[in-house]
Amino acid sequence: FFIKPNLMQLHSSYVVTDPKGSIAVECGKLMLRNGYKVKIFNSINFKKSHHYNPFAYIHSEKDILKLVTTLIANTKGDGKSGDDFWQKAETLLYTALIGYIHYEAPEEEQNFATLIEFINAMEVREDDETFENNVDLAFKELASREPNHFAVRQYKKYKLAAGKTAKSINISCGARLAPFDIQELREITMYDELELDTLGDRKTALFLIMSDTDSTFNFLISMIYSQLFNLLCEKADDVYGGRLP
């Protein structure tokens, strides 16, 4: 009784949390007919969803830190005691790996699937501190070219951890990223169609469909909102003088 009458006024862009997707069905065609771009992220049925890639909104080192903060805030670790230490350690590793992916990987590989491949390749041998896995070698090569590279600096801090501790950090990261390791989620985050950073530029309706009985993938909706608010606030301040058109 409240949402649909507001949507039907068609006076601005909208972001709608839409349990079960009924609002998108009832209002989507009207909005399309009136010149709106309509975007749908469907966490109930990924096959009926636009793609969402959080990596698509990274343009600077600051954006990398924001994405890592968003990831940590909206996902679950493995519940280790001393969570603050493990979160900080995870943050270092995510920052290093995402920095490497953003600056060194081809655009089509800048996504969570690649991040998971990196984590999976990070073998640690507790009895051999000199062992170097493929990720170590990749960062070693990058450091030889650009010793002050942002990702290299973060990775060196992570590598201060002893073998057993590093292994635990990797396990914590793997636990947090476990949902991204299912095929459907890898696919839906492979590239981006939501264009969150353009929401304030022209009339757009973004429907975020989520289950009201199963919270498994609600963290994706939370990540979208976190990135959306950051992106639009920055654009309002930097481009439009404090207010979106």
Where does each model-flagged region fall?
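P-loop NTPase motor domains
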Residues: 1-245
